[in-house]
Amino acid sequence: KPVYKYSFYIHIFAGMFCIVAALTQFSSYILKKRKAIHIWMGKTYVLVVLVLGAPTGLYMSFFAKGSFWERMLFMFMALYWFYSTMKGLQTIKVKNVLAHKNWMIRSYSMAMTAVTFRVYHLLFYYFDFDHLHNYEISLWISVLGNMLVAEYIIYRKSKSYLKTFLA
């Protein structure tokens, strides 16, 4: 399947870029002292997610190993990554910085599932889980865990937490 193969490599490149690029986005030094870098890297992150990362993730979700539910989870991840990134873009365009920051935290939490999945997968490997169960459990924990951590970070920093869902 050449389309899958190309999608896979594009998705991997996009994910690696997004993880590295986002590190500059959460730096208070860069935000305050080098705002142009923040803006340029932010625009690039959004472009890479919306054009490369999320669409290839959605395509590959149809072929993911595991059960129907794991394929649905991969679809959800791709769609939520796209949606949260789009909301981050929309909210900064109307100068709603708090909502922008919160939506981008959510977006980054989806990008980071690639990392947390591998950490859990390695951890459960040492507990002698069979490969498929390890894969499924690691996937669910990484996605739900990252989403919960993102919401906790947003909640902890925000006095108007619920308003960011409406922005």
State where each predicted segment sits:
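Alpha-helical membrane insertion/targeting regions
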Residues: 1-167
